[in-house]
C-alpha cells in the first residue's frame, strides 16, 4: 500500500497571532496552507491589542472582526507620556473612535477556530526547523508533506 503524499504551497511553523493571521490571509488568496504549532492549547493571554482602522479592515477581510462583537472597546482618548516632556500629549475625538481595544486571546481563539474548522492546523507538532527545506519531504505524524515555501513564525518564545 502506497502512502499518500500531501502537497502545499506554504508550511507555517507557529500558530501564534502572526502565524495564524498569515495562514488565513494566504488561504483567502487561494493558497494551500498548513500551519503547525507545538502547543496543544492556547495560553491564558491577558494582553490587549490596540487596533487601528487599517488593521480592523484587514480583520474584517479575514472574517474575524465580527467574531469579536462583544469583546471590543472603542478608543476615545489617547494620552502619551514620556520622561522628556512635562506636558502629556493628548488625542481625543468625541465624534468617532480612534481605534479599538481587543483581547489577544479573543482574536487568536477566533483565528484558530477558523483554521481548525478547515483542518488547516495541526497542534502538538514540534519540527526541527534546521532540517526543513522548501520542496523537500517533511514527515508529520507518519505522513509525507511537500511545501513550496516555509514561513517560520515562532515569536518571542523562540530559542534555537
Model-derived features: where do they sit?
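Short alpha-helical segment within the catalytic ATP-binding CA
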Residues: 20-21, 54
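Beta1/beta-strand and adjacent pyrophosphate-binding region of the FAD-binding site
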Residues: 2-18, 34
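N-terminal FAD cofactor-binding segment of flavoenzymes
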Residues: 45-82
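Conserved Rossmann-like nucleotide-cofactor binding loop
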Residues: 18, 41, 157
Amino acid at each position: 500500500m502506497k502512502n499518500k503524499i500531501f502537497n502545499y504551497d506554504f508550511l507555517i511553523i507557529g500558530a501564534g497571532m502572526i502565524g495564524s493571521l498569515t495562514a488565513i490571509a494566504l488561504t483567502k488568496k487561494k493558497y494551500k496552507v498548513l500551519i503547525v504549532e507545538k502547543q496543544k492549547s492556547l495560553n491564558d493571554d491577558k494582553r490587549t491589542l490596540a487596533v487601528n482602522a487599517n488593521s480592523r479592515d484587514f480583520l474584517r477581510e479575514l472574517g474575524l472582526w465580527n467574531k469579536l462583537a462583544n469583546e471590543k472597546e472603542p478608543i476615545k482618548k489617547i494620552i502619551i507620556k514620556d520622561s522628556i516632556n512635562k506636558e502629556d500629549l493628548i488625542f481625543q475625538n468625541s465624534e468617532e473612535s480612534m481605534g479599538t481595544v481587543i483581547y489577544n486571546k479573543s482574536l487568536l481563539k477566533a483565528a484558530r477556530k477558523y483554521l481548525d474548522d478547515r483542518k488547516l492546523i495541526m497542534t502538538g507538532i514540534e519540527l526541527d526547523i534546521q532540517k526543513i527545506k522548501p520542496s523537500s519531504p517533511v514527515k508529520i505524524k507518519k505522513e509525507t508533506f511537500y511545501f513550496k515555501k516555509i514561513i517560520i513564525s515562532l515569536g518571542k518564545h523562540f530559542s534555537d
